[in-house]
Swiss-Prot record:
Protein's name according to its UniProt entry: Cytochrome P450 71B7
Organism, as annotated: Arabidopsis thaliana
Keyword terms of this UniProt record: Heme, Iron, Isopeptide bond, Membrane, Metal-binding, Monooxygenase, Oxidoreductase, Transmembrane, Transmembrane helix, Ubl conjugation
An example Gene Ontology molecular-function term: oxidoreductase activity, acting on paired donors, with incorporation or reduction of molecular oxygen
Enzyme's top EC category: oxidoreductase
Record's bilayer topology term: Single-pass membrane protein
Pfam families associated with the record: p450
Gene (name only): CYP71B7
Enzyme nomenclature, EC number: 1.14.-.-
Cofactors, names only: heme
Any one GO cellular component localisation term in the record: membrane
Cross-link (Glycyl lysine isopeptide (Lys-Gly) (interchain with G-Cter in ubiquitin)): 82
Tissue expression notes: Highly expressed in rosette leaves. Also expressed in roots, leaves, flowers, and siliques.
Length: 504
């Protein structure tokens, strides 16, 4: 009742604001993108049903590949075509590469002291340059190779134990543990198998809360200037703050662990070690851009969101598609075992360059099941034209890479899992081919792309080399569906349980 009264009291303000906004956004000579009719105050919020990427895909099939929606007072353009994506992410990249400011992203980025959610500007450019040069360079990436391989060795050992017992394996949980172990070791120096302040279950809970926070809806985001009152009355502010507090406690524990007296830095320092060392050097050298603790936490936050669940859900999707497609499973396993031989004791990253059909399987998984089917929203910094339509300044822009990757104009039988489609194709997924953009493109391309690709490829190669896979007794392959769930990261809704059989 209190929320309803609040709405009624604020109704005149909403209507006046909406009138002013619509006049500002619709100069008579502008050609705005088409879209569904808006309702007073809420705009198109009533049109948002189901998962956002599938909802937008359905709407775009009716209103076109460049579509205008209004989330409350906020204009949002959804792009669902290769051509539109290329204009936004390449031709007009500079004008379209900022980020919208929301309550949740301000929290999780420590007031935009990160590279994932911070608006475009000098601070963002300086921080991104530092991260790419110091944390994601080739030498640093290679120095962590032993971690990626060790964690996969541990995975194979555990799966072998399950295989000997012929017991089903919960692949969602197993693959999450694999990726979380890799990311936590190389980024935070934390071994979740024997850490004092976090374990596998804690990390899973934190990742879920992280995604809950990023996807959190605040009225302030849709009704700038007046929505804060509804958030306060409804308790949404308190909810978001409580979730963020738990995440911040974990990040602070990571920092405290690194600065405690007597701690020995390993031969290969982790990401936090490197950033702490940079902070000390900047204090001495008097650099114009100075790292702060908030910058450090913001980067940790980015790694947590982009590094853990994305690769884990991709691996899970890969196993689901392969078990449902025995022809492809046999073809890729035959290639792997013929090429690498039948007597390897362990798989290394050097093996990845030898298996070509396997690479096509990974490419097809990235096409059908991008972990984040909607790229993180951008915001225009000036008036631009996309596909002939006028896009006003401060308009949010969403690229529906899921819709593009299933566009029948670009792909034959787009909903079918068929790696063979890439046999005579030069299409790649590293941001230069706009029909396939699992990591984005342009200035906002995922800086951790190489780590993500390698994590998926190495994990999947291990699973397919050492084991054959069957469904549990009493189950049928036809029982395995591809229903989706999630908000920012889209995963398989039902648990995938398979039985590993040791191949040799």
């Amino acid at each position: 009742m209190s929320i309803l009264l609040c709405f009624l009291c604020l109704l005149p303000v909403f209507l006046v604001s909406l009138s002013i906004l619509s006049k500002r956004l619709k100069p008579s000579k502008w050609k705005l993108p088409p879209g569904p009719k808006t309702l007073p105050i809420i705009g198109n919020l009533h049109n948002l049903t189901g998962l956002p990427h599938t909802c937008f895909r359905n709407l775009s099939q009716k209103f076109g590949p460049v579509m205008l929606l209004h989330f409350g007072f906020v204009p949002v353009v959804v792009i669902s075509s290769k051509e539109g994506a290329e204009e936004a992410l390449k031709t007009q990249d500079l004008e379209c590469c900022s980020r919208p400011e929301t309550v949740a992203t301000r929290m999780i980025s420590y007031n935009f002291k990160d590279i994932g959610f911070a608006p475009y500007g000098e601070e963002w450019k300086a921080l991104r340059k530092l991260v790419v040069m110091e944390l994601l360079n080739t030498k640093k990436f290679q120095s962590f190779r032993y971690i990626r391989e060790e964690e996969n060795d541990l995975l194979i050992k555990k799966l072998t134990e399950s295989a000997l017992k012929k017991s089903p394996v919960n692949l969602k949980k197993t693959l999450f543990t694999l990726v979380a172990s890799i990311v936590c070791r190389l980024a935070f120096g934390v071994n979740i198998h024997k850490c004092e302040f976090v374990d596998e279950d804690n990390v899973a809970d934190l990742v879920n809360k992280f995604e809950m926070l990023v996807a959190g809806v605040a009225f302030t985001d849709f009704f700038p200037g007046v929505g804060w009152l509804v958030d306060r009355i409804s308790g949404q502010n308190k909810t978001l703050n409580n979730v963020f507090s738990e995440l911040d406690t974990f990040f602070q524990n990571v920092l405290d662990d690194h600065i405690k007296p007597g701690r020995q830095v390993s031969e290969n320092p982790d990401v936090v070690d490197v950033m702490l060392d940079l902070m000390k050097k900047q204090e001495k050298d008097g650099e114009s851009f100075k790292l702060t603790t908030d910058h450090l936490k913001g980067i940790i936050s980015d790694i947590f969101l982009a590094g853990v669940n994305t690769s884990a859900v991709t691996l899970n999707w890969a196993m689901a598609e392969l078990i449902r497609n025995p022809r492809v499973m046999k073809k890729v396993q035959d290639e792997i075992r013929t090429t690498l031989g039948d007597k390897k004791q362990r798989i290394t990253e050097q093996d990845l360059s030898q298996v070509h059909y396997f690479k096509l399987v990974v490419k097809e998984i990235f096409r059908l099941h991008p972990a984040a089917p909607l790229l993180l929203p951008r915001e225009t910094m000036s008036h631009v034209k996309i596909q002939g339509y006028d896009i006003p300044v401060k308009t949010q822009m969403m690229i529906n890479i899921y819709s593009i990757a299933r566009d029948p104009k670009l792909w034959t039988n787009p909903d079918e899992f068929n790696p063979d489609r890439f046999l005579d194709s030069s299409i790649d997924y590293r941001g230069l081919n706009f029909e396939l953009l699992p990591f984005g493109s342009g200035r906002r391309i995922c800086p951790g792309m190489t780590l993500g690709i390698t994590t998926v490829e190495l994990g999947l190669l291990n699973l397919l080399y050492f084991f054959d896979w069957v469904v549990p007794v009493g189950k049928n392959v036809k029982d395995i569906n591809l229903e989706e769930t999630g908000s920012i990261i889209i995963s398989k809704k039902t648990t995938l349980e398979l039985v590993p059989l040791v191949h040799h």
